[in-house]
């Protein structure tokens, strides 16, 4: 298998590679390099002598050689068998005539026998089937009588009463304040104060005391971290004012 593959591959490569004569042109030989080709002369070949013994055991004596002479064959037990039919001429095989007038016939013969035409009978009666397919059956179309009558259309506009109720709710705001007890150790406490700006001022933000611990937000609610709890509300301010007024 491998040898066949390699031989086929070499044959395929040799088809696409140029031969030695196609690679480069050979230079002409000089006159003294090669001898001239010999002239053609017919040679006389002496006839070979006959074999000393033939394939037969009792071979006849060899006759003097004469060109074109074939020695006669002798019958022996080892010679080729003789067919008796070849000794007598063969006679032509006689064939009986078909009928009188052969080969000039009054009518030509057909190449094959054509029997009578057989008509297959259908399994059902052919008349209704033929009528159902080939004869058109008329289907009467139904007649439609259209009658028109006077019609009156009255339209009343609908009247609906809808009751509208409006409810108004006022927003209520609840403020819850818680007090953080102050312990002996200072702990950070948070206080949430809600302040409403006055009507005369335009700035809505309010900064509480203790600026280093103040966280400023954009909203009005601010978260402050300090050691002491300070609740800035109107109720506590009025309480301290009353206390200072009493003990002042």
From Swiss-Prot:
Residues 150-198 are annotated as: Disordered. The keyword Cell inner membrane does not apply. Its main location: secreted. GO terms for molecular function: endopeptidase inhibitor activity; peptidase inhibitor activity. InterPro entries: SMR-like. PANTHER family: OPIORPHIN PREPROPEPTIDE (PTHR14179:SF8), SMR1-RELATED (PTHR14179). GO terms for cellular component: extracellular region; extracellular space. GO terms for biological process: regulation of sensory perception of pain. Belongs to the PROL1/PROL3 family. This is Opiorphin prepropeptide. It is found in: Secreted. Residues 1-21 form the signal peptide. Abundantly expressed in lacrimal gland where it found in the secretory endpieces. Also expressed at modest levels in the submandibular gland. Keywords: Glycoprotein, Protease inhibitor, Pyrrolidone carboxylic acid, Secreted, Signal. The modification Pyrrolidone carboxylic acid is found at residue 22. Opiorphin is an endogenous inhibitor of neprilysin and aminopeptidase N. Inhibits the breakdown of substance P, Mca-BK2 and Met-enkephalin by neprilysin in vitro with IC(50) values of 29 uM, 33 uM and 33 uM respectively. Inhibits the breakdown of Ala-pNA by aminopeptidase N in vitro with an IC(50) of 65 uM. Has a potent analgesic effect when administered to rats by intravenous injection. Glycans are attached at residue 218. The keyword Secreted applies.
